[in-house]
A protein has these predicted regions:
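Cytoplasmic helix-loop-helix junction between adjacent transmembrane helices
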Residues: 112-149
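Conserved MFS/SLC helix-loop-helix module at the cytosolic interface between two early adjacent transmembrane helices
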Residues: 68-106
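Helix-to-loop junctions at the C-terminal end of transmembrane segments
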Residues: 69-81, 278-289, 373-374
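Structural signature of the two symmetry-related core transmembrane helices
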Residues: 84-98, 292-307
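Helix-loop-helix hairpin linking two adjacent transmembrane segments in secondary transporters
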Residues: 145-203
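Residue-level signature of mid-helix packing/kink "hotspots" within the transmembrane helices
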Residues: 35, 63-71, 155, 271-279, ...
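Extracytoplasmic gate region of multi-pass secondary transporters
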Residues: 37-38, 225-275
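Interfacial helix-cap and linker-helix signal at transmembrane-aqueous boundaries
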Residues: 44-45, 76-77, 160-169, 174-175, ...
């Protein structure tokens, strides 16, 4: 969509759209590193003879550190908020992934990926805090655009690995394909983006640290009980999203007897619906309220998740992907903004939970669904477990309350 058309459809962001889009681009450049790692592991395993356990060990180094360290670094950002945390995080994340192609020892790779994970943890709380500030009175749209950058990173990471490391045959010519040394592309992209952001956020730093903008302003207060209820909504939503997207291609293959490429096509289609729903949900939240969007989405998911495993035709299941994407992706920015408002003294910590820990903890439901599918011999039957999880999220959404005014 052309930029002018986008601004016309969402005029509320016209004043700060350059800052929001730049932060979103930074989010993309940070998150593409974590999503590149699964695509990179087969090349590392083939080159160094790593077994599955070692590959899992390396994946754990990045994802677990990035998720679990974020709340602590969020608290640090609340105390000593500095704009340069944003480019520093991008640079560390890029270097952590980029160095793996030049290392031959799994322990050195582990250390490199830990550094990359810390970089991702440094980036997210401060970047989300800045996105909140520069969004002005339209935080729903602003945070949704910021989070869409993360969705873009999810799509771009494997593509860069395919081009830079694996290569794409075009007739008798192979485009890209520099082997493991192709991971230098991540270092190059990280240096470029970090340089741009370091130059730009310096100009925002003073505004972001004024008493009105700082998360720890004098009149701010924390509502931990409300944040706990919101965390219940967020954890169930992440559990549903990660589990459904993980098994969607396998579902198309196992239940509808489709090809692997068709299953992956459905996943791409669902992801596209998700990006559109994320943006639309942010605009809806600014107009009708964050709690209302979360509740609508929570209750919309109930009948769809209950019906989906009963559908026997792929075309009808494909149609259901659109409303399900709305139910799962539309409330995300609302949850991030509400979390920042509930913990208005510690927006960095709130962002660390909503963007880090919730993703990891929610993702733990995917193995449970897989275990049930193996035990019961049916992925369609196991999919029914998503409905009670959605009920828990809907109940939590009913108890969300308005943030306390500062």
């Amino acid at each position: 969509m052309p930029l002018r058309m986008f601004i016309t459809l969402f005029p509320c962001i016209a004043m700060n759209y350059r800052k929001i889009l730049l932060l979103s681009l930074g989010h993309l450049s940070c998150d593409l590193n974590s999503h590149a790692l699964p695509a990179l592991l087969p090349y590392l395993a083939a080159a160094h003879g790593f077994d599955y356990q070692t590959c899992g060990f390396l994946a754990f180094a990045y994802s677990a550190v990035a998720s679990l360290v974020q709340p602590g670094l969020g608290l640090l950002a609340d105390r000593i908020a500095r704009g340069w945390f944003i480019p520093l995080g991008i640079l560390m994340a890029a270097m952590g992934i980029g160095a793996t192609g030049f290392l031959s020892n799994e322990y050195a790779m582990f250390l490199s990926l830990v550094i990359g994970g810390i970089g991702a943890a440094v980036f997210h709380p401060e970047a989300a805090r800045y996105a909140n500030i520069v969004s002005g009175d339209h935080k729903g749209v602003g945070l949704s655009i910021f989070s869409v950058g993360g969705n873009g990173g999810m799509l771009m990471g494997p593509v860069i690995v395919m081009l830079a490391v694996g290569g794409v045959p075009v007739g008798s010519f192979t485009f890209g394909g520099f082997g493991l040394h192709g991971t230098a592309a991540f270092c190059l992209l990280g240096i470029i983006m970090a340089s741009v952001l370091f130059w730009r956020v310096s100009a925002w730093d003073m505004a972001a640290r004024t008493p009105k903008a700082r998360s720890g302003s004098t009149g701010a207060s924390n509502d931990w009980r409300a944040f706990g209820i919101l965390s219940g909504c967020l954890l169930t939503r992440m559990g549903l999203t990660v589990a459904f997207t993980t098994y969607l291609p396998l579902y198309w293959q196992g239940v509808f007897h489709a090809s692997a490429s068709t299953g992956n096509l459905m996943l791409v289609l669902f992801s596209v619906f998700g990006v559109a729903s994320n943006l639309t949900g942010g605009a809806a939240a600014d107009r009708w309220g964050f709690r209302r969007v979360i509740r609508w989405a929570s209750f919309l998911s109930l009948p769809i998740l209950a019906i989906f495993p009963l559908v026997t035709t792929p075309w009808l299941a494909g149609i259901l992907l659109a409303p399900l994407a709305i139910a799962l992706f539309a409330p995300f920015s609302s949850m991030v903004v509400l979390g920042q408002r509930y913990l208005s003294k510690n927006m960095g910590f709130a962002s660390g939970i909503t963007l880090g820990v919730a993703v990891s903890v929610g993702g733990m439901f995917a193995p449970v669904l897989g275990w049930a599918a193996d035990a019961w011999g049916s992925l369609a039957l196991a999919m029914h477990l998503l409905t009670p999880l959605a009920v828990i999220g809907a109940v939590c959404a009913c108890f969300l309350r308005e943030p306390k005014e500062a």
